[in-house]
Design a protein with these regions (language model features):
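Short catalytic/signature loops enriched in Gly
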Residues: 3-4, 10-16, 30-50, 55, ...
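P-loop NTP-binding/switch modules centered on Walker-like glycine-rich loops
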Residues: 18, 206, 210-214, 218-296
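Conserved ABC ATPase "signature" region
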Residues: 23, 37-47, 105-106, 157-175, ...
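Conserved ABC transporter NBD signature motif
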Residues: 98-106, 118
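Hydrophobic anchor residue at the start of the ABC signature
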Residues: 143, 194, 218, 222
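Conserved ABC ATPase signature
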Residues: 180-184, 188
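A short, proline-enriched helix->beta-strand linker immediately N-terminal to the Walker B motif
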Residues: 199-203
């Protein structure tokens, strides 16, 4: 099978709620200079000259569209840039390059004041339910804070009524509003975080590994709650996770990240059935399967993930790629996302 050259994977569909174009997020750091050989141990280098500037390329040149009403899963190993991308899309982190559009409005360079009316339409559910809630605020104050900031309620009584309604929607009793976060379990705290995210009736929610810190027995409850809320409120999700089974269950489409770049993007069913990128194939081979007839042979990748400070030239995955007899382009030419015969987009020189 051959690629279809006419298709442009970067062409935004008409129903795209969020459009990301060539977005990068790099963090400047300073590295220690290597100590000159032969320098006596008692000789100390000046701090001004003992460190050299460097850049962590957390997210690089990402193109992505999130369609209205869908759940786009974002998967990859820890440290690949998933959470950084989610926060950059919401402008919680400032992009180093590229453009971000929300509902056809370019928000990339908007001032915080101009962006404020859009904030209520874009929310985030954080990974750690223990750290994302202010321990000095009651649950009611934490949920109702956004209502006051965006002037969505006219009185304290209206705010209390709205908070009680939100608590009921996430399966908590109204009297929880008078209690503090430390009085709740992890699963209950995450429900509070979800209620807070829904307070302003958003259209787009970034779910940043919302179940990774929870017990397995609680994870399914939170996923089912998110699905019910999406159906009721017509929400659009970016669901970030490293749990491939959960992502398969909840997602309409799935994007796979490696070292700050999207390497594959496809409908969930197609990606899990016939992954095209060698990295995606290796990821899915590690997913446990109950039925021995559906088990894949485990693909073991050599070495470690390269440093995002100095990513490899060409395809960043080539030092670990299990494909034999790789073409020269893998070592020298950066692969771009291209549409394959089945509609999957893959950034790979050998994928078909």
């Amino acid at each position: 099978m051959t690629a279809r050259p006419a298709a442009d994977p970067r062409a935004a569909p008409a129903d795209a709620l969020v459009s990301v174009r060539e977005v990068s997020k790099h963090f400047p750091i300073k590295l220690a200079w290597p100590r000159p050989p032969g320098l006596p141990p008692h000789v100390r280098l000046w701090r001004a000259v003992s460190r050299m500037p460097a850049t962590v390329q957390a997210v690089t040149a990402v193109d992505l569209e999130i369609r209205r009403g869908e759940t786009l899963g974002l998967v990859g190993e820890s440290g690949c840039g998933k959470s950084t991308l989610g926060r950059t899309i919401l402008r919680l982190l400032e992009p180093s390059a590229g453009t971000i559009a929300f509902d056809a409005i370019d928000v990339t360079r908007m001032s915080q004041r101009a962006l404020r009316p859009l904030r209520r339409r874009m929310q985030m559910i954080f990974q750690d339910p223990y750290a994302s809630l202010n321990p000095r605020m009651t649950v009611g104050a934490a949920i109702g804070e956004a209502l006051v900031i965006h002037r969505l309620v006219a009185s304290a009584a209206e705010r209390a009524e709205r908070v009680a309604e939100l608590l009921a929607r996430v399966g908590l009793r109204p009297d929880a509003a008078r209690r503090y976060p430390h009085e709740f379990s992890g699963g209950q705290r995450q429900r509070i975080g979800i209620a807070r995210a829904l307070a302003c009736r958003p259209e787009f929610v970034v779910c940043d590994e919302p179940i990774s810190a929870l017990d397995v027995s609680i994870q399914a409850q939170i996923v089912n709650l998110l699905e019910d809320l999406q159906d009721a409120d017509h929400l659009t999700y970016l669901f970030i996770s490293h749990d491939l089974k959960i992502v398969q269950h909840i997602s309409d489409r799935v994007a796979v990240m490696y070292l700050g770049r999207i390497v594959e993007l496809a409908e969930a069913r197609a990606l899990y059935r016939t992954p095209k990128h060698p990295y995606t194939q290796a990821l899915l081979s590690a997913v446990p399967r109950i039925d021995p007839k559906t088990r894949r042979e485990r693909i073991l990748l050599p070495g470690d993930v390269p440093s995002p400070i100095e990513p490899p030239k060409g395809c960043a995955f080539h030092p670990r790629c299990p494909v034999k007899d790789k073409p020269a382009a893998c070592f020298h030419e950066l692969p771009r996302l291209r549409v394959l015969q089945n509609g999957t987009q893959a950034a790979c020189h050998v994928a078909e």
